[in-house]
Amino acid sequence: MNQFKDKNVIITGGSRGIGLSIAKKLASNGSNIAILAKTDVSHPKLPGTIFTAAKEIEQFGVKTLPIKTDIRFDDQVESAIEKVVKEFGSIDILINNASAINLFNSESLPMKRYDLMHDINTRGTYLCSKTCLPHLKKSQNPHILNLSPPFNMKPKWFANFTAYTMAKFGMSMCVLGMSEEYKKYNIAVN
């Protein structure tokens, strides 16, 4: 039995990289895919847009919905979720993949970059999960998946990239909290 057939999936940061790979794998198993990412114009160093990703995913014969979305902004996330529900009818799976990375040490990292990582990684994950909640509650087998590391409090993981590690662990904290909080709705959070 294919557990992903006819599931409606949202993937943040799905225009390239890991997000696109996950989207293609799910699409190959029959899932409809909504891509929420802010890249609608190709970048010279980072190829791929929501539109090129959608074209790759459509080859699997599933519904695909590319939506330009900056997950730092409530109104954009709310609008995107409304579009997904209008187009697909429901949401079964949310994959929080969008992430900002800056591998500077604390002394060198501008606070603007610190804020960006936390706004996207932690706040964006929280916002997308919270906004999808009413729709996930209606699904028969709802899931939220955050692409974040397991907790490892050994100082070596923080030593060189404290701010980035904090931002990614913020995503992991969402898993811990929401898995317990959403348990009453039978929403699996990993």
What is the role of each PLM region?
Residues 7, 62-63, 90-91, 136-150, ...:
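Active-site loop of short-chain dehydrogenase/reductase
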Residues 15-16:
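Conserved glycine-rich cofactor-binding loop
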Residues 29-52:
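Conserved glycine-rich Rossmann-like NAD(P)H-binding loop of the short-chain dehydrogenase/reductase
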Residues 48, 68-80, 111:
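The beta1-alpha1 cofactor-binding region of Rossmann-like NAD(H)/NADP(H)-dependent oxidoreductases
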Residues 105-116:
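Substrate-binding pocket helix/loop in short-chain dehydrogenase/reductase
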Residues 129-130, 176:
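A short, exposed helix-loop element centered on a Lys and neighboring polar residues
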Residues 137, 145-184:
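Catalytic loop of short-chain dehydrogenase/reductase
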